[in-house]
Swiss-Prot record:
It comes from the Bacteria. The keyword Cell inner membrane applies. It is a peripheral membrane protein. The lineage of its organism: Bacteria, Pseudomonadati, Pseudomonadota, Alphaproteobacteria, Hyphomicrobiales. Its main location: membrane. Belongs to the UPF0161 family. It is found in: Cell inner membrane. InterPro entries: Membr_insert_effic_factor_YidD. Could be involved in insertion of integral membrane proteins into the membrane. The keyword Cell membrane applies. This is Putative membrane protein insertion efficiency factor. GO terms for cellular component: plasma membrane.
């Protein structure tokens, strides 16, 4: 019996479509367990940038989630934003795959 919650029941095509997503999340996992402990935990946002990136890639895939993560990383600096900044529940209405910069919030924590 197949159901959507079980990854083992997915077809090979569905599994192949998840490979980029898994690759992106694996890179974040690698960062969390290697470089992050050496640099220290000093993110200006909640959730941290690595948690944000992991959620964004899981929710929207590597392409859109990667652009959202890039925008978040560029905002996380001494002159950037700080505070609570959650991953959006839905992709922006004007975002298209061929206009990837529209996926990210480039300024402000709660700005659209």
């Amino acid at each position: 019996m197949k159901h959507s919650a079980c990854e083992h029941c997915s077809t090979p095509v569905e599994g192949a479509l998840r490979l980029p997503r898994r690759f992106g999340r694996a890179l974040i996992w690698l960062y969390r367990h290697t470089l992050s402990p050496l640099v220290g935990y000093n993110c200006r946002h909640l959730p941290t940038c690595s948690v944000y990136g992991d959620e964004a890639i899981e929710r929207f895939g590597l392409w859109a989630g990667g652009w959202m993560t890039l925008a978040r990383l560029l905002r996380c600096n001494p002159f950037g934003t700080s505070g609570i900044d959650n991953v959006p529940l839905a992709a922006p209405q004007d975002a298209r795959w061929y206009l990837p910069w529209r996926y990210g919030r480039w300024r402000g924590v709660n700005a659209p």
